[in-house]
Amino acid sequence: MDARRVPQKDLRVKKNLKKFRYVKLISMETSSSSDDSCDSFASDNFANTRLQSVREGCRTRSQCRHSGPLRVAMKFPARSTRGATNKKAESRQPSENSVTDSNSDSEDESGMNFLEKRALNIKQNKAMLAKLMSELESFPGSFRGRHPLPGSDSQSRRPRRRTFPGVASRRNPERRARPLTRSRSRILGSLDALPMEEEEEEDKYMLVRKRKTVDGYMNEDDLPRSRRSRSSVTLPHIIRPVEEITEEELENVCSNSREKIYNRSLGSTCHQCRQKTIDTKTNCRNPDCWGVRGQFCGPCLRNRYGEEVRDALLDPNWHCPPCRGICNCSFCRQRDGRCATGVLVYLAKYHGFGNVHAYLKSLKQEFEMQA
């Protein structure tokens, strides 16, 4: 019996399954089983409601982002600040106008005060100057008006200083006024301030005189000839023949002092001006000459002795001025007991001589004739 019941049950189950095939299915939307958690979460209604809530949340978030409290707070004060700034600007305009008006008034007042003070100071200064001038004119011996020259005849001359035979006269006497230059002579318009003839005669032969002693002038035999031995530092004297003189060396001779180029290491020294330049110098053909004593530059040899360096270089028998005994440099003149000449070329040309040597020679002849 049990064996028969089992297949009958199976047949019933199969029949039920066949019946279930033709049963109309119920859609998920019409399901009312809200208690089932799976049905509630998997249903379309729940999905739709979930999407709608998410969309609403997104909308609210976007609205919060676009129209959040910060944006609203930023926009509303901006409108209020514009109105406030306009009101402030309107309120400042009359205040600024009033300030500018007050400043302009104060500036005008300060300008008027400054001009008044300036005029008052000028008036006081003029009054003080007039008072001082009146007091100065009241003193006895004061001059009235401006004299054109300091050395006019109206002024008392200072007595001449006596010169004793044992004391050398001063070559640069004390000045009573500023030296007369070209600019001052143009301003003054007269040459009365030039030295007098007596003073010129007194200083005229100072260049050719010997040193004074207690007994009188020193003779040439009494002059102390200082014989100094030639040291090992002295450069050897090299006599260059005329054949070794090149055209480049002749072209390198300076005709003007402005053409000189100074060089301490490569230049050669001129005996007259003691300047070390790179221009061509003379070469003494005297065997007894030594060192750089026979080297003279172009301007010095022309202005001092009236000779040319090119002619001296091409002359095989040319001797330098120290070897001839006519050197007028400061060292040689001091060795001979005479004073230095200084820049004497302009005075020599003023008296009609072309060089200093000719001028000194004429002075010496005049001095010997008077003596």
Swiss-Prot record:
Where do the segments described as Disordered lie? 60-110, 140-188
* Region entry Interaction with MYC, spans: 146-170
For this chain, the Swiss-Prot or TrEMBL PTM comment says: Phosphorylation at Thr-163 promotes interaction with YWHAE and YWHAZ, dissociation from MYC and sequestration in the cytoplasm. In vitro, phosphorylated at Thr-163 by AKT.
One cellular component (GO) term of this entry: nucleoplasm
Question: How is expression of this protein distributed across tissues?
Answer: Ubiquitous with higher level in thymus and small intestine. Overexpressed in a large number of tumors, in blood from patients with acute myelogenous leukemia (AML) and in chronic myelogenous leukemia (CML) blast crisis.
As annotated, the protein's associated disorder is: Immunodeficiency-centromeric instability-facial anomalies syndrome 3: A rare disorder characterized by a variable immunodeficiency resulting in recurrent infections, facial anomalies, and branching of chromosomes 1, 9, and 16. Other variable symptoms include growth retardation, failure to thrive, and psychomotor retardation. Laboratory studies show limited hypomethylation of DNA in a small fraction of the genome in some, but not all, patients.
Alphabetical list of PANTHER family matching this protein: CELL DIVISION CYCLE-ASSOCIATED PROTEIN 7, OS05G0300700 PROTEIN
Q: What protein name does the entry list?
A: Cell division cycle-associated protein 7
> Which organism is this entry from?
Homo sapiens
Origin organism lineage: Eukaryota, Metazoa, Chordata, Craniata, Vertebrata
